[in-house]
Regions:
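Motif-centric detector for short Cys/His coordination patterns
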Residues: 1-100
Length: 100
């Protein structure tokens, strides 16, 4: 879908992921619009209990619009992550580190 504003056309297509990786219990995404976003694995119930090795098994599905962990049987949408829709709140220890 496009919105025309004067002579400019702005795309409203949500960005997809070009690649995904896990590092230090964070999941990172490189998006098609050039951004790199990351989130703590502990923001999702199944990922919270996963080992570091299991987290590293992340793969892209649906042309970069979904993340998949086969051994965990877990799928997460990239647009949901980009919009900040997580299952669990930030842990107190994370908030304390950021505030300090």
């Amino acid at each position: 879908m496009n919105i025309l504003a004067g002579d400019q056309s702005t795309s409203l297509i949500e960005p997809a992921a070009l690649r995904a990786w896990a590092q230090d219990r964070y999941i990172f995404l490189e998006l098609t619009d050039g951004r790199i976003v990351g989130f703590p694995a502990d923001r999702f119930r199944i990922l919270r209990s996963a080992t570091n090795e299991q987290l590293k098994e992340v793969s892209l599905r649906l042309n970069g619009y979904a993340l998949r962990w086969e051994s965990l049987d877990e799928d997460i949408t990239v647009p949901g992550v980009v919009a900040g829709r997580f299952q669990l709140p930030l842990g107190e220890e994370f908030v304390a580190r950021v505030v300090a």
